[in-house]
């Protein structure tokens, strides 16, 4: 990648545990630099990195590792704006933000607010607030267009993350799993089980894929009624070392149960895999003759999803069309309607959604909502 002119940014996932300390993060930064990283990114996936700790971490990385440091956080807990200012003052070379229509909640802090907060300081980014306002006005329209598809929970601040430290995306997955099992009333038990499973697995940071590995096992432990009464395949692979070396030691009893059935591996897990790109290209070109390497990589990562996507695309159901249908259906279901004087004539939301080709997607949705309000 670097030979092709790219820049290698290596990520340090911020988390807290008995094995995650300032010194351990700096040591990881040194290892990443030795591997050839051009810059470091501190990823606060849960949005619970306090301003003072963020500042201390960035300052230590800049001074002791010597690489530029980017900070990526989320507004989930409400601290992100304060944390961003603290890390900039500590020497961060960049922070990730989002334009105000898409900021806050599970997203990043607003670009405009931080530009205003840093104006006149040594870290002034010299961005035109007027131009940013124009961009925000445009994307506010985009936001309204897709509002029917938004999960309102993802737009809100959740200070509870400061105590349970379960990132928003992971919490959504837990809710979905419990809803499927008709067990939403046991969410508190699962939330309490998550840190126990995480400790058993050596305190991995709760970020994809380990957040799903920990979360699913926590759900199993609660619903089965016995801890590790059923061990998921992903936990077994993790314990055996197929996801790399854990930050801390794995629970000895759990390790013994897993490795008694299949031995642990040593070394780099990817070295156990045979080269597969040529095979993937052959398989994907059986579906799409003109497929390139990018298509093959998509197929390799998500084979079932890719096949479904290609089958839908062949029928004309491209992402744009599917989005329009979803917008129409959700908009029809959510639109406020006055009590009718007489029984209304049945209307098919699908037939309405199929009329998107008569005009732009946004124009059709606006017209559809106007009809619903009449």
Give the ranges of each region predicted by the language model.
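Terminal or standalone catalytic/regulatory effector modules within metabolic enzymes
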Residues: 156-160, 169-374
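Catalytic alpha/beta core domains of metabolic enzymes, predominantly
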Residues: 45-229
């Amino acid at each position: 990648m670097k030979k092709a002119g790219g820049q290698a940014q290596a990520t340090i996932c911020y988390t807290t545990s008995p094995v995650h300390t300032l010194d351990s993060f700096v040591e990881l930064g040194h290892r990443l630099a030795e591997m050839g990283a051009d810059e470091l990114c501190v990823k606060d996936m849960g949005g619970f990195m306090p301003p003072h700790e963020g500042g201390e971490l960035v300052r230590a990385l800049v001074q002791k590792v010597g690489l530029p440091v980017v900070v990526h956080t989320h507004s989930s807990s409400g601290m992100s704006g304060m944390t961003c200012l603290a890390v900039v003052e500590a020497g961060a070379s960049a922070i990730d933000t989002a334009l105000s229509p898409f900021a806050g909640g599970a997203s990043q802090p607003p670009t405009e607010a931080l530009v205003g907060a840093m104006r006149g300081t040594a870290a002034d980014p010299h961005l035109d607030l007027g131009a940013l306002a124009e961009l925000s006005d445009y994307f506010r329209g985009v936001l309204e267009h897709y509002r029917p598809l938004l999960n309102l929970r993802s737009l809100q601040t959740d200070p509870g993350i400061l105590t349970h430290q379960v990132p928003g995306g992971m919490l959504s997955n837990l809710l979905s799993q419990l809803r499927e099992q008709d067990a939403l009333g046991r969410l508190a038990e699962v939330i309490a089980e998550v840190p126990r499973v995480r400790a058993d697995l050596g305190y991995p940071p709760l970020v994809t894929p380990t957040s799903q590995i920990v979360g699913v096992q926590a759900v199993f432990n609660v619903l089965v009624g016995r801890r590790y009464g059923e061990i998921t395949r992903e936990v077994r692979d993790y314990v055996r070392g197929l996801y790399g070396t854990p930050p801390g030691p794995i629970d000895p009893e759990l390790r013994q149960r897993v490795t008694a059935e299949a031995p642990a591996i040593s070394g780099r897990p990817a070295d156990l895999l045979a080269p597969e790109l040529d095979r993937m290209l052959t398989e994907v070109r059986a579906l799409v003759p003109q497929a390139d390497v990018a298509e093959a990589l998509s197929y390799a990562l998500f084979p079932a999803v890719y096949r479904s996507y290609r089958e839908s695309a062949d029928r004309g159901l491209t992402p744009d069309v599917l989005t329009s249908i979803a917008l129409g259906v959700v908009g029809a279901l959510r639109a406020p309607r006055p009590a009718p004087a007489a029984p209304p004539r049945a209307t098919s939301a699908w037939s309405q959604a199929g009329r998107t080709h008569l005009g732009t997607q946004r124009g059709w949705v606006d017209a559809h909502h106007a009809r619903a309000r009449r």
